[in-house]
From Swiss-Prot:
It catalyses: adenosine(1518)/adenosine(1519) in 16S rRNA + 4 S-adenosyl-L-methionine = N(6)-dimethyladenosine(1518)/N(6)-dimethyladenosine(1519) in 16S rRNA + 4 S-adenosyl-L-homocysteine + 4 H(+). The keyword DNA-binding does not apply. This is Ribosomal RNA small subunit methyltransferase A. It holds the Pfam family RrnaAD. It comes from Burkholderia ambifaria (strain MC40-6).
Length: 273
């Protein structure tokens, strides 16, 4: 596989984190994993040169119900519009600022399926942005750096367990689906990649907790992850009865379950009312 940054006449732009998927076997496996069906309301983030876009459109799109796509690179937008016409509705702009709820069906029922080969340089901020629309989403399938996927699905007590793990596991059921090697891309990235499936919990399954407070607690806990929680959460000891919660501060952040972090955030909410 060539290391050239040019593919199909387009130069991959480093500032957009562009690595184009070119392995047709991998593309078929990804589309099978996603399982698109006619008439579904699907959004692709960063369609690039259309490697996933084409088979997705073939399986689900009609002029009345097109595939939606959010793309920042204006050079690619013109090519995609010309290639797919009314079967693809393009939204020019940054996915980090895009209102995905604007594409949801009317009503309270989740209706969006979101997919994409996410730019690795903005993957974590984008995942947190998407979290704010989770109630409108049926599922998400993303290509990400394998290290990020491992952190997303990591269990407590492992080195990979992190702030990202806690915040996403609170909101989604997640599963690593496929490994994707560097040679599947043009130009090949310097890291391994993987596909992750993310299914939001339904409202009745979610704990009653303010995600902002949960984020505050988790960020503090992981701010110095090699230190004991008695140090990183020390500022909360005057307001939260950790002993009453059965919360052992003689641990590190990676050793605490999502449910325990939720409990601390709930206790914090109670004293701040």
């Amino acid at each position: 596989m060539s290391n050239s940054r040019q593919h199909q006449g387009h130069f991959a732009r480093k500032r957009f984190g562009q690595n184009f998927l070119v392995d047709h076997g991998v593309i078929d496996s990804i589309v099978t994993t996603i399982g698109p069906a006619r008439g579904q309301r699907m959004v692709e983030i960063g369609p690039g040169l259309g490697a996933l876009t084409e088979p997705l459109i073939a399986r689900l799109a009609t002029p009345e119900s097109p595939l939606h796509a959010v793309e920042l690179d204006r050079d690619l937008i013109g090519r995609l519009q010309q290639r797919f016409g009314p079967l693809l509705e393009l939204h020019a702009g940054d996915a980090l600022a895009f209102d995905f709820r604007s594409l949801a069906a009317p009503g309270d029922k989740p209706s969006l399926r979101i997919v994409g080969n996410l730019p690795y340089n903005i993957s974590s901020p984008l995942l947190f942005h998407l979290m704010t629309f989770a109630d409108a989403v049926i599922d998400q399938h993303f290509m990400l750096q394998n290290e990020v996927v491992e952190r997303m699905v990591a269990e407590p007590g492992t080195k990979a367990f992190s702030r990202l793990s806690v915040m996403l596991q609170y909101r989604y059921v997640m599963e690593k689906m496929l490994d994707v090697p560097p040679e599947s891309f043009q130009p090949p990235p310097k890291v391994d990649s993987a596909i992750v499936r993310m299914i939001p919990y339904e409202p009745h399954e979610l704990p009653d907790v303010d995600p902002v407070l949960l984020g505050e607690v988790v960020t503090a806990a992981f701010s110095q992850r090699r230190k004991m929680l008695r140090n990183t959460l020390g500022d909360y000891r005057e307001t939260i009865d950790f002993d009453g919660l059965g919360f052992d501060l003689a641990r590190r952040a990676e050793d605490v379950s999502v449910a325990e972090y939720v409990g601390v955030a709930q206790a914090l909410a109670a004293v701040r009312r």
